[in-house]
């Protein structure tokens, strides 16, 4: 299932699928945790959409915490938007917030 809007980013709503995507080869997997009511999520969404199209070094997915509360709870999501970075099934780190410059700085630690 694709995320809201015209994005090519897949929305993950099942824990099984979440577990599958974070284990993808050695490329970086970025999971964006968001909700439709979250203003900051809407603020950064166009930037995230653009990033997913422009960077082939990463796999980018979204988890709508309104529908996939279990995944958000299991991942310890306590703020939106939150981005978690994975490689080979291991979480490398996370970023919370909608500041695009700070997000890119955090992302650059893993790409």
Language-model segment annotations:
Residues 1-6, 75-76, 88:
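Non-globular targeting/processing and membrane-anchoring segments
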Residues 1-29, 105-111:
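N-terminal leader/targeting and pre-domain segments
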Residues 11, 29-32, 59-62, 82-86, ...:
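Beta-strand cores of modular interaction/reader domains in eukaryotic scaffold and signaling proteins
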Residues 12, 24, 35, 54, ...:
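Intrinsic disorder
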Residues 12-14, 33, 45-70, 77:
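Thiol-based oxidoreductase modules, predominantly thioredoxin-like and allied folds used
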Residues 19-50:
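Local sequence-structure signature of Cys/Sec-based thiol-disulfide redox active-site neighborhoods
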Residues 35-36, 67, 88-90:
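Conserved beta-strand elements of beta-rich interaction domains across eukaryotes
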Residues 78-79, 84-111:
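Non-catalytic, surface beta->alpha helical segment in thiol-disulfide oxidoreductase systems
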């Amino acid at each position: 299932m694709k995320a809201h809007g015209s994005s090519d980013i897949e929305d993950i709503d099942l824990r099984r699928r979440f577990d599958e995507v974070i284990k993808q080869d050695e490329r970086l997997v970025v999971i964006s945790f968001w909700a439709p009511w979250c203003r900051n999520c809407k603020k950064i969404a166009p930037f995230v959409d653009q990033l997913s199209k422009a960077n082939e070094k990463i796999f980018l997915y979204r988890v709508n915490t309104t529908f996939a509360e279990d995944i958000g709870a299991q991942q310890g999501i306590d703020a939106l938007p939150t981005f978690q970075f994975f490689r080979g099934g291991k979480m490398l780190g996370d970023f919370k917030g909608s500041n695009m410059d700070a997000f890119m700085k955090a992302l650059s630690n893993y790409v």
